[in-house]
Structure formats: C-alpha cells, structure tokens
Amino acid sequence: QRQMCIRDRGKAFDNRAGLSVMIEAFKKLCREGHPNTLIAAATVQEEVGTRGARTAGVAMQPDCVIVLEGPPADDTPGFAVTDSQGALGGGVQIRLFDPTAIANPRLAALAEKTALDAGIPFQLTVRRSGGTDAAALHLSGKGVPSIVLGIPTRYIHAHNGVLDLRDYRAAVELTVALARSLDQEAVEALTHYLP
C-alpha cells in the first residue's frame, strides 16, 4: 500500500514557500475568476530591509495586501510549548502582529472568518521577533490594509527546511478564498470607520 507523503523538505523555504503559494493561488484564481485586479510581486531583500517590498508598494499602489510567507514552526525539540505558535500540520498561519507590522484588524477578522466558513485549518500567531514584507507594504502610500499568511516551516533559513503539505494547501485555499471575498465594498470597509 502506497503512503501519501505529507511533509516535504528543501532549501530555504523562507520565502520560496510563499512564492509557490502565490503562483498556485494565481493559477486557480485565473481559472475560476475573482472580482479583483490582482498583482503578484516576488520581492527581494526582505531579510535586509524589505527593499523590494518598499519599491513594489510605491509602484503597485495596492488597495490591500496579502503577504505570503514561510514563517518559523515552533514545534521543534527544545522549544517551550508555551511559546509555540506555529506547528507543522496545524494549518496556515494568520499573523496578527510582529515587531514590524500589525495586521489590519478587519482584514485579520475577515481572514479568520473566511477560513472558518471554508473549513480551512489555521493558526493565529503573534511573533515577538522577525518581520515580513508587510513591514514596508502596510506603510506605503496612505497606508495599506495588510495581512500575512504563512506556511509554518522548520529550519527556515537552512538547507533542509521542512513543511507540511497540508499547511501549504491550506495557505493556497485561504489565499484564493480571501482574494475572492475582497471586492471593492469589502476593501473599502477595511479602512472606512465612519458612516
């Protein structure tokens, strides 16, 4: 009997995992349709100052941003269970906060509701260290509602990173479902607080 592989390994999944999710999500959205003008950006130098994201934010002038990332899985031996937020097989991570960016609260709530409604497994995370391209993108222009969706990954900057393919698929599904739900009215509701 053939067993299905649920874990994969490879070099430097941060941020190759996010790029792969973006490609798969865009393929699906192009085939099945959506209400938006979508722009994909594969940026460079996130680890040394989000340089690519800074210029991308200026060039794209986005109304809303979904950052796709390969964040750390905290389920490795020796890591305190009380500090563990991301685990392989626990679903896509929805990041609420890190030292460089705070998720738009309405977009975070929409991501969580979208995942719940679609039965997509997810993990809410708050990181005490690190950051993503959301650091630059959420500050571009007049400010951009942003959310980080991540595929939890062990040993993210090593030659042998490990991820769970179920988390990967959950990230693709949530990215697609969230993009579909973000029509003009939904995007405007992310930043308009007064009647």
Residues of each region from the PLM?
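A short glycine/serine-rich beta->alpha loop
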Residues: 7-13, 97, 162
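Short, well-ordered secondary-structure micro-motifs
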Residues: 50-54, 76-80, 135-136, 159-161
